[in-house]
């Protein structure tokens, strides 16, 4: 079962990452679905729970693979909504959220293993760490932000807030993460 702070982070994750029920190309041109779930191949697409547009008829593996091929050949750099087409397979919210929760729970476990004392941190700090791990990847966060990790381990929220800025994301998202570290003393 997910920790309460993991569940509390879900709406923020959807806000920052966006949420799209069909395949689209992310900013790097990778086929993606729901909240930033990269689908690396047509074969990988076949294992996803996808439905025809009405949401009641499950797609065949052939339909899933064909949809992946269709979207992978489209022009990248557009809004995710522009990749939907008549009859495109969709992911139901219950299935997409189950995938999201599984990913967040795995990141939470990885953070607990990678940051000594993580379990005892304030929930707001854990949410900021989840956001960074979701955005950067667990390894990218743990290895790419050593000064921030040091400040977290030391219980220095202000120091962590000063170190948590990421390039390439919105100022609003960076400010939200910093505010989480500033909001509660360890």
Task: Please annotate each region the language model reported.
Residues 1-127, 151-186:
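Acidic, aromatic-lined catalytic clefts of primarily extracellular/periplasmic carbohydrate-active enzymes
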Residues 119-136, 142-143:
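Charged, low-complexity intrinsically disordered segments
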Residues 42-45, 138-145:
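Short, solvent-exposed secondary-structure capping/transition elements
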Residues 110-113, 135, 139:
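Amphipathic alpha-helical interaction surfaces
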């Amino acid at each position: 079962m997910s920790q309460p702070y993991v569940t509390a982070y879900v709406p923020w994750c959807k806000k920052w990452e966006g949420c799209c029920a069909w395949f689209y190309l992310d900013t790097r041109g990778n086929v993606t679905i729901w909240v930033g779930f990269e689908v690396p191949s047509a074969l990988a697409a076949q294992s996803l729970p996808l439905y025809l547009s009405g949401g009641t008829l499950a797609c065949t593996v052939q339909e899933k693979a064909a949809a992946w091929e269709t979207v992978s050949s489209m022009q990248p750099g557009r809004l995710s909504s522009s990749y939907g087409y008549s009859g495109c397979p969709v992911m139901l919210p219950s299935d997409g959220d189950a995938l999201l929760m599984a990913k967040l729970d795995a990141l939470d476990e990885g953070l607990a293993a990678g940051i000594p004392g993580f379990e005892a941190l304030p929930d707001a700090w854990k949410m900021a760490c989840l956001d960074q791990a979701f955005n950067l990847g667990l390894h990218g966060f743990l290895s790419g932000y050593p000064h921030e990790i040091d400040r977290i381990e030391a219980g220095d929220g202000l120091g962590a807030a000063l170190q948590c800025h990421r390039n390439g994301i919105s100022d609003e998202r960076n400010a939200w993460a910093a505010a989480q570290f500033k909001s509660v003393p360890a």
